Amino acid sequence: LVPAVQSGQVDCVIAGQSITKERQQMVDFTDPYYYASIITLVKNDGDYKDAASVEDLKGATVTSQQNTIWHDSCLPQIPDGNILPAQESAPAMLVALEAGKCDAVVTDMPTGKAACVAYPDFKLLDFTGTDGEFEVSDEDINIGISLKKGNDELKDAINGVLSEMTEDDFNKMMDEAISVQPLSES
């Protein structure tokens, strides 16, 4: 995504990108439009279906999508977790869970909700707000729109629109995106 923005192939990217210091060296970002909730997906009939905390995932074989904080920061927090290589895409990650190659995947709430629609045998586990949640920084979970460095006109225009939106507006947009997101590779 970053190379497409840098090269001018696209003007901006709205794709759940965390606003990290590393990415900010390569592209500019709008103000955050979303703060991601980290969730875990398991199979309804799997060994970890009753997990109520990260600790309860002890020993699980897990994966997530490449180039995400879910894979880089969250999976290592699972005690004795068997961390598989990062998956190329959200659909690939979900297919790994569906096929039994892993016990759980860690991702964000919108991806998790969409996955449960595409895969009814998945269960969404949300440890947010409990003592057993994944430990992340605000930088890890603040989501913004990336654009080419120095494109202040576009950045200001997007920030102007974002500043007028309410939490309900954002939630409605997220729900609409979830309803049309093609997460199944079948």
Which residues make up each language-model segment?
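Proline/Glycine/Serine-rich low-complexity intrinsically disordered segments
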Residues: L1-S186
